[in-house]
Every structure is written in structure tokens, then in C-alpha cells.
Amino acid sequence: GILPKAKWCDVVVCVPFVNIPAAIRAFKDMRIAVGAEDLYFEKSGAYTGEVSADMLKDLGVKYVIIGHSERRQYFGETDMTVNKKVHAALEVGLHPIICVGETLEQREMGITMELIALQTKAAFAGVPAEKANEVCNAIRATIRNLYGARVARSVTIQYGGSMNPANAAELLAQPDVDGGLIGGAALVPEKFVDIINAANQE
């Protein structure tokens, strides 16, 4: 009952597979979309335990996170895997929330910008320009190089580096930050509400 109306921002809650039906029921009368935390790129086959894009769509999911740092770190996900998942999501009309970014070691090496550009190019490889409009959380400069200024302006870029109530307003005021991919702060309802309120002020 404490969730404010998201007048100027879109709210998407991405939950584990088993919680998707309950989340859709819980948010059905609110302006909150439900997303998944991952998908598998094959449409069908003997892939025990995997969940395809078609399965997510059948559940009523609108969004899916692809390429999260934890997937890359713990499950060995590569840029090629991310690209396959992007194609699978777009093929069935899901909005992919594509995560790109560097590790602490890579940041200290000074290769952040180069790495992000490479990850973004890899994620979008082979994606037609008309489909790129559906994609969230890419790097505007790289998209502009790939598809032109019109598509670059339509892309939503979200900050995923631990946005919280204390830094949300400052981060969201940055010209190239359109939103946040909220992690730990979203687990505390009051903190999540504070971030939404900050977004509504922008």
C-alpha cells in the first residue's frame, strides 16, 4: 500500500522463475510490469531445467534481464551467449534488459569504456535496426554508431551500480542515465519506494 504512482517512470520487477505467476497476480492492478531474471536461447530441445523465451511469454512476462554480471561470473556466460539470448527475446516480443559492465579488476586496468563498447556490440550483433528500438539498457554512443541517432535516442540506459535512496536523485539527474537496475535496495520496500519517488521527480 506504500508504493507511489509511477507518473514519470516505468517500474519493472524481475523475479525468479518460480515467483513469476505470483508477481503477475500481485501487480495486475498496478502500473508495474513483471520480468524474468534470465532465459535460455533455444526454443525447444532436451535442456533440462532451462526456461525459453516462449515459456516466459506464455506466463505473461514482458521483460527479461540478459547478461547480468552474476550470470557472467558464476555461470560462464559469454558475449556470444548474451547475443543469442537477445535474439531469442526479441523474436517473441520480450523486452531485453541487457547488462554490460566491467569487473573491479577491469576497471582498475582502465579498460571500462572499451569493454562496455565490445559487450554492447556483441549483444546487438545481427539485430536489425527496427528491433533495436525494443532494447533497453545499452550504451547510447555505441548504438548511435550501429544504428544512427534516431535509434540511439529511443534506447533506455539504466545504471546498475548499486543505486539506492541516497544516490538515486543524483544518478538519475545525469543526462545519459534514464533509470536504474535496482538490486539489493529493491529488497527493502521502503528503499524501493524512495528510489521510485526520486525517479518521479525527474
Put a short name on every predicted segment.
Residues G1-E202:
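Active-site loop-to-helix "anion-binding N-cap" substructures in soluble metabolic enzymes
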